[in-house]
Amino acid sequence: MQVADISLQGDAKKGANLFKTRCAQCHTLKAGEGNKIGPELHGLFGRKTGSVAGYSYTDANKQKGIEWKDDTLFEYLENPKKYIPGTKMAFGGLKKPKDRNDLITFLEEETK
């Protein structure tokens, strides 16, 4: 298991670009924007897997039971299907730790 090195602050600007090119087609960021193909990400940090109202999760997501934080997102974003076998998340993951830190830094600000 890799753990996020939170002492290495990511670049939110680079994270914004990653979100736009890799995530925005399926996810929204702000309260009230609603679910798309994937659940809205508003309030992501501190939320349990499989808990966004109105989104149809797989049993695997509902039963994972972890809380989204820097370290859990860091591991998940490397390979979502490995972290939650049975997820319907189609995204293949971000292999570079720097990219994951950049995206997490962006998400920490934009999903509040």
Curated annotation (Swiss-Prot):
Biological role: Electron carrier protein. The oxidized form of the cytochrome c heme group can accept an electron from the heme group of the cytochrome c1 subunit of cytochrome reductase. Cytochrome c then transfers this electron to the cytochrome oxidase complex, the final protein carrier in the mitochondrial electron-transport chain.
Gene: CC-1
N6,N6,N6-trimethyllysine PTM sites in chain numbering: K81, K95
Name this polypeptide is given: Cytochrome c
Subcellular location: Mitochondrion intermembrane space
GO CC annotation terms, alphabetical: mitochondrial intermembrane space
MF terms in GO: electron transfer activity; heme binding; metal ion binding
PANTHER family: CYTOCHROME C
Keyword tags: Electron transport, Heme, Iron, Metal-binding, Methylation, Mitochondrion, Respiratory chain, Transport
Residues that bind heme c: C23, C26, H27, M89
Organism, scientific name: Arabidopsis thaliana (Mouse-ear cress)
Similarity remark: Belongs to the cytochrome c family.
Modified how: Binds 1 heme c group covalently per subunit.
Domain of life: Eukaryota
Pfam families recorded: Cytochrom_C (PF00034)
